Amino acid sequence: MKTLKMQRRVAAELLKCGENRIWIDPERVDDVASAITREDIRRLIKEGVIKKKPVKGQSRYRARIRHEQKKKGRHRGPGSRKGKKTARMGKKELWIKTIRALRKELRKLKEQKKIDRRTYRMLYIRAKGGQFKSKHQLYMFLEEHNLLKKR
């Protein structure tokens, strides 16, 4: 087997790819070995003796399957998580999610006449200040301070 290092390098330059992607016809190795100029290499490329192999891609098969599983909620447990809690959902996003839920609940209570306007305003401001982490905490506060009107 002849070494075709120089021919491979020149062909790689001409075909604008890496040396590993150069295919040389095993039947015509002697012709390639005798080619010493760039012009000779160009001629062999034209004849199809030297070709450029296609790029090897990265198969998405397993990734697609994993993605489908994740859509179903698999592979999302504590053992699969990397990074902080805030890396998965930002602090601001979490705040928006919480405050929207609280404000919606307060609006509902006001419309149902379970709390009056003054109580609503007081609770709204406290929610804005971050006193309640959840709707449950809001209801606990309402019960402790007897702020819910009985119908």
Swiss-Prot record:
Keywords: Ribonucleoprotein, Ribosomal protein, RNA-binding, rRNA-binding
UniProt KW Nuclease keyword: no
CDD domains cross-referenced by the UniProt entry: Ribosomal_L19e
Gene Ontology terms for molecular function: large ribosomal subunit rRNA binding; structural constituent of ribosome
Keyword Methyltransferase: no
Region annotation (Disordered) ranges: 56-89
Domain of life: Archaea
Gene Ontology annotations for the cellular component aspect, listed alphabetically: cytosolic large ribosomal subunit
Biological process per Gene Ontology, one example term: translation
A Pfam match: Ribosomal_L19e
Functional note: Binds to the 23S rRNA.
Subunit structure, as described in the record: Part of the 50S ribosomal subunit.
Family listed: Belongs to the eukaryotic ribosomal protein eL19 family.
Listed name of the protein: Large ribosomal subunit protein eL19
